[in-house]
Amino acid sequence: MKERDSRNQIGDLPFRVKEGFSVYEFIEQLYEANVVERINRFLVKVTFNGKEFLAHLHDPGRLKDLIYPGNLVLIRETKGYKTKFSITAAYSNSRFVVLDSRLHNIIASKFLPEAYEKEIKVGNSRIDFKYDNTYLEVKGCTLVENEIAYFPDAPTERGRRHLKELRELMKKGFNAILLILVMRDDAKCFLPNEKTDPKFSIEFWNSIKEGLNVNIKTFKLVGNKIIYVRDIPLCKTNLT
C-alpha cells in the first residue's frame, strides 16, 4: 500500500484547525459498556454496571468490526430519545472510534469560514455546506483495514447521488469538495470501498477526474474530547 503524493491531494479548506486541537467536547460523562447484540440499525443492547440497557446508535453503517457481542463501547446519557443512552464510540485496534454521525457537520464546520450556509437544496439532494463559490459534502468514515480508511462500509445510494449532484454543480462553475472525516487515527490513506459499493467507487473516481476536491481528515478521542490529528492522502492506485 502506497500513499498518494499529498501535493496532488487538492481540496484544502479555508480555516486550518491546528493538528492536536479539540474540535468537539462531550459535556456528558462517558461510561464503558459492553455490546450484547445489535437489535437493528439504530438500537444496540449493552451491559452497564451489571444491567442490560438499550442504547441508541446514530450510525447506519454495518459496523461489523465495531458493534459485535462483547466489544467495549462508550455510552452517554441522552435526552429526547426512547433509550436512556447513546453509543458514542467503540473499541478497535487499541483505540476508541467515534460513531455518532450527528457530530460530523459540527466538526466539519470548524474547518470553514464563519459565513457559510447549511443544508442547501440541490436537485433531489441537500448538500451539507456552501461558502463563497464552493459546495461541500461531509462523509464520516469508521472502517480502517491495514492502515487504509474505507468509505462506505455499507452500500449508499445517497452517497452516490451526492457525488452526481456535486458534478452537476462543477459543470455550472462552482467548486466542490468532498470532506471525509475518519473518526480514528490509525489510517495512513483513504480509498473508496469498491468491494462494498462498487457503484460509489466508480462515481468517486469519475468525480475526481471531473474536478472534485477531496479532503480527508483523521481524528481521535482523548478523554471527552475529539482531537483533530492530521490530513491523509488518497492511497496510490492505478486510478490516482
Swiss-Prot record:
Pfam families for this protein: SfsA, SfsA_N
Question: What GO terms are given for molecular function?
Answer: DNA binding
Q: Which domain of life is it from?
A: Archaea
Alphabetical list of CDD domains matching this protein: SfsA-like
Annotated disulfide bonds: none
Family affiliation: Belongs to the SfsA family.
> What is the official name of this protein in its record?
Sugar fermentation stimulation protein homolog
> Which species expresses this protein natively?
Saccharolobus islandicus (strain M.16.27)
Instruction: Name the gene that codes for it.
Output: sfsA
